[in-house]
Amino acid sequence: MASQQGGYPPQEGYGQPAGYGSPTQQHAGMAAGAPVQGHAGGKKKRAYAGEAFEIGSGANAALGGQLPAGGSYGAYPPQPQAAGYQQPVYGADPSQMNAAAPGYTAPVTPGIAQMTQQFGAMGVTDPHLMPPQPPQAAVAPQAPRPVPLNQLYPTDLLTQPFNVAELDYPPPPIVLPPGTSVYPSPTANCPPKYVRSTLNAVPTTHSLLKKSKLPFALVIQPYASLRDAEDPIPVIPDQVISRCRRCRSYINPFVTFLDHGHRWRCNMCNLTNDVPQAFDWDAALQKPADRSLRPDLNHAVVEFVAPQEYMVRPPQPLVYLFLIDVSYASVTNGLLATSARCIKESLDRIPNADRRTRLGFIAVDSSLHYFSIPRDGSENSDPRMLVISDLDEPFLPIPGDLLVTLSECRENIETFLDKLQEMFQNTQNNGCAMGSALRAGYKLIAPVGGKMTVLSSSLPNVGHGSLTMREDKKVLGTSKESSLLQTANSFYKSFAVECSKAQVSVDMFLFSSQYQDVASLSNLPRYTGGQTYFYPGWNAARGEDAIKFAREFSEYLSSEIGLEAVLRVRATTGLRMNTFYGNFFNRSSDLCAFPAFPRDQAYVVEVAIDETVTKPIVCLQTAVLHTTCNGERRIRVLTLALPTTQNLADVYASADQQAIATYFSHKAVERVLSSGLEPAREALQAKAVELLSTYRKELAGGSVSGGGLQFPANLRGLPVLFLAMIKNLGLRKSAQIPTDMRSAALCLLSTLPLPLLIQYIYPKMYSLHDMPDIAGLPDEQTGEIVLPPPVNLSSERIVPYGLYLIDDGQTQFLWVGRDAVPQLLLDVFGLPDRSQLRVGKQNLPELDNDFNQRVRAVIEKSRDHRSKGVGSIVVPHLYVVKEDGEPGLRLWAQTMLVEDRADQSVSLVQWMGSLREKV
């Protein structure tokens, strides 16, 4: 099985899920339909002799394309459809075949909600520009107010089922009163890709927030790419930084100028401050500047170059210390050779504009091997290896030569990396003293700070922080399983806190085919602003494995991280930052410390309402003080303004379902680590029931008309996302999930940026055999590859002759139906016969035909993080899965179909029914 699956651990063959309605059974009855009449509209683009075509069947039948402008929330008009690869010979009545469930009915005025969404996406929030809201569609009479907020559109979750396309809608628009910002700039408010609030209309009192049962939290992702050039924002170089004397907020587009512009009133605490003398002076041109053009008054997201007083010490250089496992396991699976080659090939990509970047290397087996690398041009250019066997108190031999400047030693670093593999190629050493190596590395870089990058294939089994094999298959799926997700050795938490104080960050790259205790090791990244990257069953002999790691590690090394960073969130008087979630160390009640600030993670901050808010808007300002890779101290400031309301209907109508799901993902991980898996799953279900009950009681008049399940249009996806979370690898009830897989999933659930997290919880599925003609080709306007419309994750949407891509952002599956026609297999795989199709990890062949090129374009576009507005190093593996092929692989792919019944979990229909009963 391992060979077929390409390294997926053998124990990961999920047991045959009880009641997993296999696509085979679900479609068996459809083959007996009437013979197909007619042909595909005369299209000759893909005329396959002997193939019957139909328009309007298959998963894309009811979707057929992107949502047209003016379409209403949830109503998906049919589109012109490509004649796809359909079933061979036998026909099926298209009316029975997988027609997508109809969207819920439009509001009384067609298209209002969709237009509202589109205005929100464009940043148009002036109420005079908003379409008139239909009073007859509103729920609960509203108190008169100067600006109408978003309307509440009730829908029935049972009669109008969730459609996956709803997850692609922008959040409810932020509707601010006119004249809120000091200048009418379209960029005055923070875009959702940087900061999203769970509530886009904020209750004025704690009691109203409590009554709503909704969380008030921010999802913060200060960077939308791995490198500045990919997502430039305004940088203010003049070092004139105007801050409030009392609350220390930064001047922003929502302040008010007084006294002929000589003073400004803080929009957080109302204090009046003097405008700095140099505020209206252009230092570069040495002449007065136009204040209305200042970036900090027009842009919600800006970066200030910080003056001397923002530094505790001079900006430190970028330091990478590589701790490389050279034990028998690491040499035999190819990790040592692959990582050495990859570092060598990425030396030009490591940020080094200021030519101060420093590198160091420690090799680890049962001893520690330090390497002294001479400068280029030295008499002796050979690296020297120094072996330390005292693991309890590892000392630093000649510490001055162990961290070398990349620019000065470039050639000799390459020489060293070429020789590293040879030094250990005959090893039989099974020891791994990684804990002691971390201690030694800490001593080496603590004076300057930096990153320790661990590359390991073994369980640390000697020296500091040694761990034992504690996974017991008998406890998997039981209440005792949660203990395996806790840290086994207190060293990892206490050492992580030490690292954080010395500005040392740790990233873990873990490659074991055996148990590696990810639960313990992941504490190091968790408290130091790092990340855990997990490669189960990895082996460089499989080209796909080697290429995936090489691409990801090269991206990792080229990322422009921030150093010595702190993050703080300030807000309007009456609001308080309550709890922080993410990978960092909480240094004080409101200060998060990051020895290195990554660009591929998001953070969640829960907000408390301590006092009644009297203003029509509140502001929340995130500031990240950091040193760039190039040695410049900067402050990235992100300011978000939100309207306030005393009306519960407004709160619900402006709630952001994806931000709420992200908040509860972090809460669920916290609950797993503190109380266990079952309490976390129960808490999610209880929350879903509580929200539905509150809405019914407070806003739907308490009635249960016709046995429905009422919820607002903008939150329709929330119950589905909760179910998908409960079924995620990190939380799912199962006796088949290895502890390391689960721990790695929990790391993702608590760090992924919002778009990637939602996709990880509710993966994307695209029907490829019948995708629209424009799919897989560049859009005429944007040049971006067009994706087919997404399909709900249910086996009812899968036809036996179909080809589907299922993608959760970490792994991609190409599902080939058991009745796929030969021409489809020939076009996509270049194989005339289905029996020749190899399953498992692979890359699609590049063939000279239109359809193969489009399928490959869709697969590649689905991996494109930049178009999602996030940075990520991940390159998902592609697994080819045959519907009637290798069972373990097929069952793994089917766990992505979160709307189906599986293993020990319910289907979406059963879940909605149980929520209905409890409500």
Curated annotation (Swiss-Prot):
SUPFAM superfamilies: beta-sandwich domain of Sec23/24, C-terminal, gelsolin-like domain of Sec23/24, Helical domain of Sec23/24, vWA-like, Zn-finger domain of Sec23/24. One of its GO terms (cellular component) is endoplasmic reticulum membrane. GO terms for biological process: COPII-coated vesicle cargo loading; intracellular protein transport. Residues 1-43 are annotated as: Disordered. Residues 244-269 are annotated as: Zinc finger-like. Keywords: Cytoplasm, Cytoplasmic vesicle, Endoplasmic reticulum, ER-Golgi transport, Golgi apparatus, Membrane, Metal-binding, Protein transport, Transport, Zinc. InterPro entries: ADF-H/Gelsolin-like_dom_sf (IPR029006), Gelsolin-like_dom (IPR007123), Gelsolin-like_dom_sf (IPR036180), Sec23/24_helical_dom (IPR006900), Sec23/24_helical_dom_sf (IPR036175), Sec23/24_trunk_dom (IPR006896), Sec23_24_beta_S (IPR012990), SEC23_SEC24_subfamily (IPR050550). GO terms for molecular function: SNARE binding; zinc ion binding. Zn(2+) binds at C244, C247, C266, C269. Its main location: cytoplasm. It is a peripheral membrane protein. It comes from the Eukaryota. It is found in: Cytoplasm; Cytoplasmic vesicle, COPII-coated vesicle membrane; Endoplasmic reticulum membrane; Golgi apparatus membrane. Residues 1-21 have a biased composition (Low complexity). Belongs to the SEC23/SEC24 family. SEC24 subfamily. The COPII coat is composed of at least 5 proteins: the sec23/24 complex, the sec13/31 complex, and the protein sar1. Golgi apparatus membrane; Peripheral membrane protein; Cytoplasmic side. Component of the coat protein complex II (COPII) which promotes the formation of transport vesicles from the endoplasmic reticulum (ER). The coat has two main functions, the physical deformation of the endoplasmic reticulum membrane into vesicles and the selection of cargo molecules. This is Protein transport protein sec24. It comes from Aspergillus fumigatus (strain ATCC MYA-4609 / CBS 101355 / FGSC A1100 / Af293). The lineage of its organism: Eukaryota, Fungi, Dikarya, Ascomycota, Pezizomycotina.
